[in-house]
Amino acid sequence: MTFRALLLSAALMATSTTAFADIGDSETITGTDDVKLTATHLETFNKPWAMAFLPDGKALVTEKEGTIWLLNAEGKKLGEITGGPDIIERGQGGLGDIYVPSDFDQTGEVYISYVERDAKDDSLSGAVVQSATLAISSNGGSLSNMKRVWTQSPKVQGNGHYGHRIGVSPDNFLFISSGERQKFTPAQNMNTNLGKVIRLNRDGSIPEDNPFVENGGIASQIWTLGHRNPLGLDFDSEGQLWVHEMGPKHGDELNKIVRSENYGYPMVSNGDHYSGVEIPDHETMPIFEAPAVFWVPAISPAGFSIYKGDVFADWKGDGFIGGLSSQALIRVDMDAEDGPSEAGRYEWGKRIREVESGQDGAIYVLEDEEGGRLMKLMPATE
């Protein structure tokens, strides 16, 4: 697989022309690709984590401390969604992803991920994915029929690297990204689902054609292994799954997910441990699947959307990644001649947690932490 290191100096970073803070304010942002975007501030949240659009153009936003918001088609808060799970926010854990399948109009079903504490030992935690029925009202809505479809196992100490991003494939399988919980070796252990990409039937049962189904137990859930902290996933127009993950100290990755493959962590990485201990690069062990793209320095990827709209016609099929430490929106040309590569970077000045594409063709960005803004991106007009 073709891959490349992408090193961009601060001098090449994108610039914004104005500062803004109030809802309704807009600014023009110019990327390293010289494309100008108009970014409009639609709404503000407290530690937002994920966003999903409903078929009618309304949207849902999760906040890490446990609130789920319903937004109108203009991105304004209509009210809260009640009936969600009880949340204890700690470290990187709390309320996580929310996903609206394409058959929502027929089923009313959504998926939610969050972190739960162990009932007997509060120091232990793990991610959970539940399905639920969502009923919408004029000023919010409610969740009912909550059903656990997946549990991260085992629960371990620490409050990081949960992953817990959710997607449903075009052929109707449930995919979940699971981080290795900052424990390194579980990513290679087939008796845990830590550090894996998981494939399930929509009800949480095991597909009979999963690659390790004959192993039984937890291994039967596993689609791929050797992942660190995968915080973004999406399917392209051909149904191919792509997942990005944070590397250790540098070496963030965008991976083309191939059934049963091992992506190498912690045996290989294009980054090194924070302790300074070196990790062999991917090229030293070709037995492992190498990333399509890796980043040195790190971008700290979070949120991922492959653009399928028409407003940005030249960007159809491109991937958009939010950057936490890089405080930037990164565009990846997924169809570049030599393989996927970074094609543009929009300096943001704030950590980006989530990126989504709307039915209106706009790109939506959620900033991280308290006061995180929801921003709508459209082509800038001269």
Name what the model sees in each region.
Residues A21-T38, S138-L143, S205-N215, M267-P286, ...:
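Blade/loop signatures of beta-propeller domains
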